[in-house]
Amino acid sequence: MGQKVNPHGFRLGITTDFKSRWYADKLYKDYVKEDVAIRRMMTKGMERAGISKVEIERTRDRVRVDIHTARPGIVIGRRGAEADRIRGELEKLTGKQVQLNILEVKNPEVDAQLVAQAVAEQLSSRVSFRRAMRKSMQSSMKAGAKGIKIQCGGRLGGAEMSRSEFYREGRVPLHTLRANVDYGFFEAKTTFGRIGVKVWIYKGDVKNIAEVRAENAAARAGNRPARGGADRPAGRGGRGGERGGRGRKPQQSPAAEAPKADAAAAPAAESTGTEA
Protein backbone atom coordinates (compact mmCIF):
# COMPACT_ATOMS: atom_id res chain seq x y z
CA MET A 1 0.00 0.00 0.00
CA GLY A 2 3.02 2.29 0.02
CA GLN A 3 2.33 3.19 -3.61
CA LYS A 4 -1.04 4.67 -2.67
CA VAL A 5 0.39 7.23 -0.22
CA ASN A 6 2.04 10.52 -1.09
CA PRO A 7 5.63 10.18 0.20
CA HIS A 8 5.71 13.81 1.38
CA GLY A 9 2.61 13.50 3.54
CA PHE A 10 3.63 10.05 4.76
CA ARG A 11 6.95 11.39 6.12
CA LEU A 12 5.69 14.81 7.22
CA GLY A 13 7.40 15.85 10.43
CA ILE A 14 9.87 12.96 10.22
CA THR A 15 12.08 13.71 7.23
CA THR A 16 10.05 16.36 5.37
CA ASP A 17 8.86 19.79 6.45
CA PHE A 18 5.68 21.76 5.82
CA LYS A 19 5.43 23.82 2.64
CA SER A 20 3.01 26.27 4.29
CA ARG A 21 4.10 27.67 7.65
CA TRP A 22 1.50 29.76 9.46
CA TYR A 23 -1.12 29.51 12.20
CA ALA A 24 -4.75 30.61 12.06
CA ASP A 25 -7.89 29.95 14.03
CA LYS A 26 -10.97 31.41 12.35
CA LEU A 27 -9.22 32.31 9.09
CA TYR A 28 -7.84 28.82 8.51
CA LYS A 29 -10.08 28.01 5.53
CA ASP A 30 -9.37 31.40 3.94
CA TYR A 31 -5.61 30.91 4.22
CA VAL A 32 -5.81 27.41 2.75
CA LYS A 33 -7.83 28.77 -0.17
CA GLU A 34 -5.25 31.54 -0.70
CA ASP A 35 -2.39 29.03 -0.65
CA VAL A 36 -4.08 26.91 -3.31
CA ALA A 37 -4.71 30.02 -5.43
CA ILE A 38 -1.08 31.15 -5.06
CA ARG A 39 0.33 27.78 -6.13
CA ARG A 40 -2.14 27.56 -9.01
CA MET A 41 -1.07 31.02 -10.17
CA MET A 42 2.60 29.98 -10.08
CA THR A 43 2.03 26.85 -12.16
CA LYS A 44 -0.54 28.22 -14.62
CA GLY A 45 1.48 30.71 -16.64
CA MET A 46 5.01 29.51 -15.95
CA GLU A 47 5.29 26.04 -17.41
CA ARG A 48 8.70 26.85 -18.91
CA ALA A 49 10.15 28.26 -15.68
CA GLY A 50 10.59 24.82 -14.11
CA ILE A 51 9.05 25.60 -10.72
CA SER A 52 9.77 22.82 -8.23
CA LYS A 53 7.81 24.00 -5.19
CA VAL A 54 6.33 27.11 -3.60
CA GLU A 55 6.75 27.70 0.13
CA ILE A 56 4.44 30.15 1.92
CA GLU A 57 5.03 31.72 5.32
CA ARG A 58 2.62 34.19 6.91
CA THR A 59 2.91 36.79 9.66
CA ARG A 60 0.34 39.28 10.87
CA ASP A 61 0.75 41.79 8.05
CA ARG A 62 3.12 40.11 5.59
CA VAL A 63 3.23 37.05 3.34
CA ARG A 64 6.56 35.52 2.32
CA VAL A 65 6.57 33.41 -0.85
CA ASP A 66 9.65 31.34 -1.75
CA ILE A 67 9.71 30.06 -5.33
CA HIS A 68 12.17 27.23 -6.02
CA THR A 69 12.86 27.15 -9.75
CA ALA A 70 15.38 25.64 -12.13
CA ARG A 71 15.31 28.73 -14.40
CA PRO A 72 15.26 31.83 -12.17
CA GLY A 73 15.88 34.13 -15.13
CA ILE A 74 12.42 33.39 -16.54
CA VAL A 75 10.74 34.12 -13.19
CA ILE A 76 12.69 37.33 -12.61
CA GLY A 77 12.29 38.63 -16.15
CA ARG A 78 14.13 41.49 -17.82
CA ARG A 79 15.24 43.96 -15.12
CA GLY A 80 12.89 42.27 -12.66
CA ALA A 81 9.72 43.10 -14.60
CA GLU A 82 8.24 39.60 -14.28
CA ALA A 83 9.01 39.44 -10.55
CA ASP A 84 7.30 42.81 -10.01
CA ARG A 85 4.25 41.61 -11.92
CA ILE A 86 4.04 38.44 -9.80
CA ARG A 87 4.44 40.43 -6.60
CA GLY A 88 1.65 42.79 -7.64
CA GLU A 89 -0.73 39.93 -8.41
CA LEU A 90 0.07 38.26 -5.09
CA GLU A 91 -0.55 41.48 -3.16
CA LYS A 92 -3.83 41.90 -4.98
CA LEU A 93 -4.80 38.32 -4.12
CA THR A 94 -3.80 38.36 -0.45
CA GLY A 95 -4.37 42.02 0.39
CA LYS A 96 -1.07 42.12 2.32
CA GLN A 97 2.53 43.06 1.69
CA VAL A 98 4.30 40.23 -0.15
CA GLN A 99 7.98 39.35 0.16
CA LEU A 100 8.95 37.38 -2.94
CA ASN A 101 12.10 35.23 -2.88
CA ILE A 102 13.25 33.40 -6.01
CA LEU A 103 15.59 30.49 -5.22
CA GLU A 104 17.49 28.41 -7.76
CA VAL A 105 17.40 24.60 -7.68
CA LYS A 106 21.05 23.54 -7.86
CA ASN A 107 20.51 19.98 -9.14
CA PRO A 108 17.27 19.77 -11.18
CA GLU A 109 18.02 16.20 -12.37
CA VAL A 110 17.39 14.92 -8.82
CA ASP A 111 14.21 16.96 -8.20
CA ALA A 112 11.18 14.70 -8.70
CA GLN A 113 8.79 17.50 -9.70
CA LEU A 114 11.18 18.86 -12.33
CA VAL A 115 11.85 15.37 -13.69
CA ALA A 116 8.09 14.79 -14.02
CA GLN A 117 7.73 18.09 -15.87
CA ALA A 118 10.59 17.16 -18.22
CA VAL A 119 8.98 13.81 -19.07
CA ALA A 120 5.60 15.50 -19.61
CA GLU A 121 7.14 18.06 -21.97
CA GLN A 122 8.64 15.27 -24.06
CA LEU A 123 5.31 13.44 -24.18
CA SER A 124 3.62 16.64 -25.36
CA SER A 125 6.25 16.87 -28.12
CA ARG A 126 5.22 13.37 -29.31
CA VAL A 127 8.36 11.63 -28.04
CA SER A 128 7.95 7.93 -27.24
CA PHE A 129 7.03 7.53 -23.58
CA ARG A 130 9.51 4.69 -23.09
CA ARG A 131 12.36 6.76 -24.50
CA ALA A 132 11.39 9.77 -22.37
CA MET A 133 11.23 7.68 -19.20
CA ARG A 134 14.54 5.91 -19.76
CA LYS A 135 16.35 9.11 -20.70
CA SER A 136 15.18 10.87 -17.53
CA MET A 137 16.10 7.85 -15.40
CA GLN A 138 19.64 7.75 -16.80
CA SER A 139 20.23 11.46 -16.23
CA SER A 140 18.92 11.24 -12.64
CA MET A 141 21.11 8.26 -11.77
CA LYS A 142 24.16 10.01 -13.23
CA ALA A 143 23.33 13.10 -11.14
CA GLY A 144 23.59 11.15 -7.88
CA ALA A 145 20.19 9.57 -7.22
CA LYS A 146 20.28 6.17 -5.49
CA GLY A 147 17.03 5.03 -7.06
CA ILE A 148 14.24 6.29 -9.31
CA LYS A 149 10.83 5.11 -10.43
CA ILE A 150 8.78 6.74 -13.20
CA GLN A 151 5.18 5.82 -13.99
CA CYS A 152 3.05 7.04 -16.90
CA GLY A 153 -0.69 6.46 -17.08
CA GLY A 154 -3.18 7.25 -19.83
CA ARG A 155 -3.61 6.53 -23.54
CA LEU A 156 0.03 5.61 -24.03
CA GLY A 157 1.04 5.66 -27.69
CA GLY A 158 -2.49 6.65 -28.72
CA ALA A 159 -4.03 3.34 -27.62
CA GLU A 160 -7.80 3.17 -27.30
CA MET A 161 -7.66 1.68 -23.80
CA SER A 162 -5.68 3.54 -21.17
CA ARG A 163 -3.05 1.75 -19.11
CA SER A 164 -0.08 2.53 -16.90
CA GLU A 165 3.55 1.50 -17.23
CA PHE A 166 6.51 2.17 -14.97
CA TYR A 167 10.26 1.71 -15.03
CA ARG A 168 12.46 1.49 -11.96
CA GLU A 169 16.20 1.62 -11.50
CA GLY A 170 18.05 1.31 -8.21
CA ARG A 171 16.34 1.14 -4.82
CA VAL A 172 13.14 3.04 -4.00
CA PRO A 173 11.90 2.20 -0.45
CA LEU A 174 8.28 3.24 0.03
CA HIS A 175 7.71 2.29 3.68
CA THR A 176 11.05 3.26 5.26
CA LEU A 177 10.32 6.50 7.07
CA ARG A 178 13.95 7.59 7.36
CA ALA A 179 14.37 7.29 3.57
CA ASN A 180 14.50 10.60 1.73
CA VAL A 181 12.06 9.88 -1.11
CA ASP A 182 11.12 12.84 -3.29
CA TYR A 183 7.82 12.67 -5.20
CA GLY A 184 6.52 14.66 -8.14
CA PHE A 185 3.45 14.61 -10.38
CA PHE A 186 2.64 16.38 -13.64
CA GLU A 187 0.11 15.99 -16.45
CA ALA A 188 1.10 15.98 -20.10
CA LYS A 189 -1.42 17.41 -22.57
CA THR A 190 -1.40 15.35 -25.77
CA THR A 191 -3.71 15.03 -28.77
CA PHE A 192 -5.05 11.75 -27.33
CA GLY A 193 -5.81 13.21 -23.92
CA ARG A 194 -3.90 13.76 -20.72
CA ILE A 195 -1.14 11.45 -19.51
CA GLY A 196 -0.18 11.52 -15.84
CA VAL A 197 3.49 11.28 -14.92
CA LYS A 198 4.57 10.24 -11.41
CA VAL A 199 8.18 10.22 -10.25
CA TRP A 200 9.76 8.79 -7.10
CA ILE A 201 13.46 9.57 -6.43
CA TYR A 202 15.39 8.01 -3.54
CA LYS A 203 18.27 10.18 -2.33
CA GLY A 204 19.43 8.20 0.72
CA ASP A 205 18.55 8.06 4.40
CA VAL A 206 18.28 11.24 6.47
CA LYS A 207 18.13 12.07 10.16
CA ASN A 208 15.11 13.10 12.17
CA ILE A 209 13.62 16.43 11.13
CA ALA A 210 14.19 17.84 14.65
CA GLU A 211 17.91 17.04 14.47
CA VAL A 212 18.13 18.53 10.99
CA ARG A 213 16.48 21.76 12.17
CA ALA A 214 18.77 21.93 15.22
CA GLU A 215 21.90 21.41 13.13
CA ASN A 216 20.81 24.04 10.61
CA ALA A 217 20.13 26.54 13.40
CA ALA A 218 23.52 25.80 14.98
CA ALA A 219 25.26 26.18 11.63
CA ARG A 220 23.61 29.55 11.08
CA ALA A 221 24.65 30.68 14.56
CA GLY A 222 28.21 29.46 14.01
CA ASN A 223 28.14 27.09 17.00
CA ARG A 224 28.33 23.32 16.99
CA PRO A 225 25.57 21.43 18.82
CA ALA A 226 26.71 20.34 22.28
CA ARG A 227 27.01 16.62 22.81
CA GLY A 228 26.98 14.71 26.11
CA GLY A 229 30.32 13.25 27.19
CA ALA A 230 33.03 13.71 29.79
CA ASP A 231 31.91 17.23 30.69
CA ARG A 232 28.34 16.36 31.66
CA PRO A 233 27.24 17.05 35.26
CA ALA A 234 27.38 14.35 37.91
CA GLY A 235 24.34 12.15 38.37
CA ARG A 236 23.27 10.04 41.31
CA GLY A 237 25.96 9.32 43.88
CA GLY A 238 28.40 11.67 42.17
CA ARG A 239 28.74 9.42 39.10
CA GLY A 240 29.06 11.86 36.27
CA GLY A 241 31.61 12.64 33.61
CA GLU A 242 34.10 9.99 34.70
CA ARG A 243 31.68 7.26 33.62
CA GLY A 244 32.47 7.48 29.92
CA GLY A 245 31.68 3.81 29.38
CA ARG A 246 31.44 0.62 31.37
CA GLY A 247 34.60 -1.47 31.47
CA ARG A 248 36.83 1.32 30.20
CA LYS A 249 40.03 2.20 32.07
CA PRO A 250 40.95 5.85 32.61
CA GLN A 251 43.61 6.96 30.16
CA GLN A 252 46.94 8.29 31.49
CA SER A 253 49.51 10.51 29.87
CA PRO A 254 52.79 8.99 28.53
CA ALA A 255 54.78 11.11 31.02
CA ALA A 256 53.01 9.44 33.96
CA GLU A 257 53.50 5.95 32.52
CA ALA A 258 57.29 6.33 32.06
CA PRO A 259 58.25 6.28 35.82
CA LYS A 260 56.09 3.19 36.35
CA ALA A 261 57.89 1.38 33.54
CA ASP A 262 61.33 2.25 35.05
CA ALA A 263 60.24 1.11 38.50
CA ALA A 264 59.02 -2.20 37.09
CA ALA A 265 62.27 -2.74 35.20
CA ALA A 266 64.54 -2.17 38.27
CA PRO A 267 63.35 -5.20 40.37
CA ALA A 268 63.64 -7.39 37.31
CA ALA A 269 67.30 -6.44 36.90
CA GLU A 270 68.04 -7.11 40.60
CA SER A 271 66.45 -10.55 40.48
CA THR A 272 68.50 -11.58 37.46
CA GLY A 273 71.68 -10.43 39.21
CA THR A 274 71.08 -12.59 42.32
CA GLU A 275 70.35 -15.66 40.25
CA ALA A 276 73.60 -15.25 38.34
From Swiss-Prot:
It holds the Pfam family KH_2. Residues 216-228, 254-269 have a biased composition (Low complexity). Residues 216-276 are annotated as: Disordered. GO terms for cellular component: cytosolic small ribosomal subunit. GO terms for molecular function: mRNA binding; rRNA binding; structural constituent of ribosome. InterPro entries: KH_dom (IPR004087), KH_dom-like_a/b (IPR015946), KH_dom_type_2 (IPR004044), KH_sf_prok-type (IPR009019), Ribosomal_S3_C_sf (IPR036419), Ribosomal_uS3_bac-typ (IPR005704), Ribosomal_uS3_C (IPR001351), Ribosomal_uS3_CS (IPR018280). SUPFAM superfamilies: Prokaryotic type KH domain (KH-domain type II) (SSF54814), Ribosomal protein S3 C-terminal domain (SSF54821). Keywords: Ribonucleoprotein, Ribosomal protein, RNA-binding, rRNA-binding. GO terms for biological process: translation. Residues 229-245 have a biased composition (Basic and acidic residues). PANTHER family: 30S/40S RIBOSOMAL PROTEIN S3, SMALL RIBOSOMAL SUBUNIT PROTEIN US3C. Part of the 30S ribosomal subunit. Forms a tight complex with proteins S10 and S14. This is Small ribosomal subunit protein uS3. It comes from Streptomyces griseus subsp. griseus (strain JCM 4626 / CBS 651.72 / NBRC 13350 / KCC S-0626 / ISP 5235). The lineage of its organism: Bacteria, Bacillati, Actinomycetota, Actinomycetes, Kitasatosporales.
